Design a protein with these regions (language model features):
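Short alpha-helical segment of the dimerization/phosphotransfer core of two-component systems
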Residues: 40-48
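Conserved catalytic submotifs in the C-terminal HATPase_c
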Residues: 66-71, 88, 93-104, 141
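Disordered, acidic interdomain junction associated with two-component signaling
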Residues: 78, 85, 89, 140-160, ...
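ATPase catalytic-site recognition across NTP-hydrolyzing enzymes
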Residues: 176-180
């Protein structure tokens, strides 16, 4: 794990240093291109550090979930907008299929829900080749009451999200390792596609904190489906539904 983390941190750091040196050497060249590359590398480094901090907070029991009003379609649209660039760059089609009748005015931690979906979509983009497809599907079901649940029965909903890809797939013997901390399928995959191996672990921990469940189905050379289900409470006096899903992203 330490070797993989060191490699992942070193890569964006090298990028930051290299482009900073180029910007200094080529004084007559507009620095925007180098600054953009430095910014991208800095963001990649920040993501790694944030993952490490999240794991540390969760394992120490110091991470608290917010309970605030949010719109589910805003969360999904933001994720797909951010993921769209990398998907298009890789020649991948990104499609969103959101049940038009599901409730979208919810109460919960929108930031952490967005983090879960973003991790799953980013992972799918990483392991799907040119000409492939990723489909984000959201459905709604009935949620059973939880201990100390203050949400009235008529406002309880179960949000189910599927992220399907036509990527490389995962062998059955590795499926049980995917959501474990500091575990990856194999080192060669890590080197080819990058990543610390913390993203799926964080997804599992966040979903469990939300009293939900997460699972995966996969077949080598066919693709994978990562899915999770969490109970949420709808906002009072709100009948807002996803009349139109976020626009499908075409390459």
């Amino acid at each position: 794990f330490l070797a993989n983390i060191s490699h992942e941190i070193r890569t964006p750091l090298h990028g930051i240093m290299a482009f900073a040196e180029l910007a200094l050497l080529k004084e007559k060249t507009p620095p925007h291109r180098y600054l953009r590359a430095i910014l991208q590398s800095s963001r990649a480094l920040l993501e790694i550090i944030n993952d490490l901090l999240d794991v540390s907070k969760i394992e120490a029991g110091h991470l608290e979930l917010e309970q605030a009003p949010f719109m589910l379609d805003d969360v999904v649209h933001h994720v797909c907008t951010v993921a769209l660039h990398n998907a298009h760059a890789g020649g991948i089609e990104l499609v969103v299929d959101m049940d038009p009748n599901m409730q979208i005015a919810l109460i919960g931690d929108a930031g952490r829900l967005q983090q879960i979906i973003m991790n799953l979509v980013t992972n799918a983009v990483k392991f799907t080749g040119p000409g492939g497809q990723i489909c984000v599907t959201l459905k709604q079901g009935h949620a059973e009451p939880l201990p100390s649940d203050t949400c009235p029965e008529q406002r309880r909903v179960q949000i189910i999200c599927f992220v399907r890809d036509t990527g490389v797939g995962i062998a059955p013997e590795f499926l049980g390792q995917l959501f474990q901390p500091f575990r990856q399928v194999d080192a060669s995959t890590t080197r080819r596609h990058g990543g610390t191996g913390l993203g799926l672990c964080i997804c599992r921990q966040l979903v469990e904190m939300m009293h939900g469940e997460i699972w995966v189905e996969s077949e080598p050379n066919v693709g994978s489906t990562f899915a999770f289900s969490i109970p949420l409470c709808t906002q009072p006096d709100s009948g807002a539904t996803a009349q139109l899903p976020p626009p499908p992203a075409q390459p």
